[in-house]
């Protein structure tokens, strides 16, 4: 892996240097093998970009470039530049959430400054031939932060009230909460409606595609 960048500008320069390159070219330099597809290697693109950009946090709660206060997010896009899938933000806390505020939340920390890297995501393009797009450094506007905060507070209220099982992907205007587990057996602690501990599937916060589409549209228009 390349050393961690010491400044925001150094990180941006690195991201600009890999724009236009294919996954095959980037994997070759990193000594990584391109998988046939992403079905069993969902995190492969992120790991490839982390190697080239010198990200250190992996999937821990900290930002990928903690010393710079920047999170790295790849975003698969269509031929027309629209996001093809929701963006995972972080795992949702299901216990110990009483008194937790938006200002202290992992979601706010992760989204305070994001380096978005669009990548070609159309399925018919072989993975090795897909290319990386131009990077975009983004922080939420006051309006965007207000939207995120409102959704986060609503979703967390359901968790506090022990209604995690009733939350569906339809809840939340820009932020949604969905099960995040490779299989249905990976259960975690949560609260039931009676306040007693229950076992539940881990949940993750995800940004809806219409929210990320607006970010890309404003920047690349």
Curated annotation (Swiss-Prot):
Recall the GO molecular function terms of this protein's record.
DNA binding; endonuclease activity
Q: Where, subcellularly, is it found?
A: Cytoplasm
UniProt keyword Flavoprotein present: no
InterPro entries, A to Z: DNA_mismatch_repair_MutH, DNA_rep_MutH/RE_typeII_Sau3AI, DNA_rep_MutH/T2_RE_sf, Restrct_endonuc-II-like
Pfam families to which the protein is assigned, alphabetical: MutH
Q: Which GO terms describe its cellular component?
A: cytoplasm
| A GO BP entry | DNA modification
Where does the source fall among the domains of life? Bacteria
Q: SMART domains annotated for this entry?
A: MutH
Which keywords annotate this record? Cytoplasm, DNA damage, DNA repair, Endonuclease, Hydrolase, Nuclease
Q: What is its main location?
A: cytoplasm
Q: List the disulfide bonds.
A: none
Enumerate the Gene3D superfamilies for this protein.
DNA mismatch repair MutH/Restriction endonuclease, type II (3.40.600.10)
Q: Give the record's family classification.
A: Belongs to the MutH family.
Summarizing the function annotation, the protein's role is:
Sequence-specific endonuclease that cleaves unmethylated GATC sequences. It is involved in DNA mismatch repair.
Q: Please give the NCBIfam families that the UniProt record associates with this protein.
A: mutH_TIGR (TIGR02248), PRK05070.1 (NF003458)
Q: What is this protein called?
A: DNA mismatch repair protein MutH
């Amino acid at each position: 892996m390349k050393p961690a960048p010491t400044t925001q500008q150094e990180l941006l320069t690195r991201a600009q240097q890999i724009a236009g390159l294919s996954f095959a070219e980037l994997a070759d330099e990193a000594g990584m093998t391109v998988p046939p597809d992403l079905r069993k290697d969902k995190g492969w693109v992120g790991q490839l970009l982390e190697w080239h950009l010198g990200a250190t946090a992996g999937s821990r709660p900290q930002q990928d470039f903690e010393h710079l206060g920047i999170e790295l997010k790849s975003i698969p896009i269509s031929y027309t530049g629209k996001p093809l899938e929701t963006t995972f933000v972080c795992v949702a806390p299901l216990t110990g959430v009483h008194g937790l505020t938006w200002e202290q939340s992992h979601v706010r920390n992760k989204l305070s400054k994001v380096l978005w890297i669009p990548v070609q995501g159309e399925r018919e393009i072989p993975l090795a031939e897909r290319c990386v797009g131009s990077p975009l450094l983004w922080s939420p506007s006051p309006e965007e932060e207000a939207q995120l905060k409102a959704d986060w507070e609503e979703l967390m209220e359901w968790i506090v009230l022990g209604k995690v099982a009733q939350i569906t992907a339809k809840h939340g205007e820009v932020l949604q909460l969905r099960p995040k587990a490779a299989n249905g057996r990976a259960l975690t602690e949560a609260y039931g409606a009676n306040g007693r501990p229950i076992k539940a599937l881990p949940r993750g916060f995800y940004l809806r595609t219409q929210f990320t589409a607006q970010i890309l549209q404003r920047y690349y228009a």
